[in-house]
Each structure stands twice: as C-alpha cells, then as structure tokens.
Amino acid sequence: IVCFDRDVFGDCPDFRFPETPEGPRPTFGSILEPAPPEKYILTDRLWDYLQRYAEKHRAKGNGFGFGLANPDGVSRTLSARYYKDGSEILIVRGKRKNPRRLTIVEAARLMGYGELVKTRDDVPVSDTQAYRQFGNSVVPLVVTAVGRQILEVMKTRIDDEKGFTLLKQNPRSKRRRKALRTS
C-alpha cells in the first residue's frame, strides 16, 4: 500500500508501481544449497503429521496443509512462522524421502539477502529468530523499486529555498501546513 497526503499531493498523485523486470526469472532451485545439513530434513513423525493434517483439511474443503516447492518453479511465500515446521515451503528430495525445510542461507537468498549471507555464520541469531526475521522481511529490491517511484512523486512537490528542501503546499489544501524540513 502506498499513500500520499491529499493536502500536499492532491487527490490523484501520478504514482505507478514499478514494472516487473524483463528477462529470465530465477528458479527456486537456483537458491538451493547442494548438500544441506540433515537437520533440515523433516522427521518421519513431522512428515506423517503434516500429511494427515493436510488430508483432514482437504476432506473438510479447507486449504490448510503444506506446500511442496518445485525447484524448476517459483517459491511459495516465506512467513515468520516458518520456524515451526517449514510447511509452507518444503523441498522435495525424491520418492520415498521426507522433504526438507529451507536452510537459513536459502531463506536469506529467497528474500534477497544472498549477497550478505554466504554461510550460516553470517546470521548471528538462532534458526528460529532468523526464520522469523526473514519471514517478516520485505525483499530489498522490491522496497528499493517502490521507494524510487515514491520519490518521483515527491519530486513533483519539492522546492529548494535558502538551502532547505521543502515540500510545497498544495494550493487546494484546506488547512495550512508547515513546510517539512529534511536534511
């Protein structure tokens, strides 16, 4: 959601969400580690539980369950609850093998932090906290692109005066506002 103050920007500022970049998109498999630690493989007990839980809700007509991610496709959404059982994004390991969860490095790559997180040691918190933080995060490239579009709209209302950057008052504004001073 992007909002602008009507008193400053009017009823319909010329904001446009950024276009999706052209060209090939990365696949889910491109973020996966070749030999992840075994601790990320679901136990027989957890895998059985998730399958029973999904079947119970499927019978009721609900959409609850787990999500198996196709390495050749795109990922499902990583949420802050991922640390609990990883059920939103489970990685297929082959027939008769329990799926696995994302590693912390893979979760970082998925959310756009691949340049900052090369190894597990680059994340100074527990797995639980890392999954929560990555799951609550917004992909930095998306925030950057939306932020640039917001700045374009803001530039239409900016006036340089005596070394200060001021937002111009909308002439149709009902109430007078003090100019915002930024550094």
Question: What do these predicted regions represent?
Answer:
Residues 168-183:
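Short Lys/Arg-rich cationic patches that frequently serve as NLS/NoLS or arginine-rich RNA/DNA-binding motifs
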Residues 82-127:
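FAD-binding beta-loop-beta segment adjacent to the flavin cofactor pocket
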Residues 143:
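Acidic-aromatic/histidine active-site loop/patch
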Residues 147-158:
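Short, hydrophobic alpha-helical segments
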Residues 14-17, 156-172:
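Short, flexible loop/turn segments with low-complexity composition
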Residues 139:
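A helicase ATPase "motif cassette" and its flanking acidic/Ser/Thr-rich regulatory loops
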Residues 1-77, 81-83:
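Class I S-adenosyl-L-methionine
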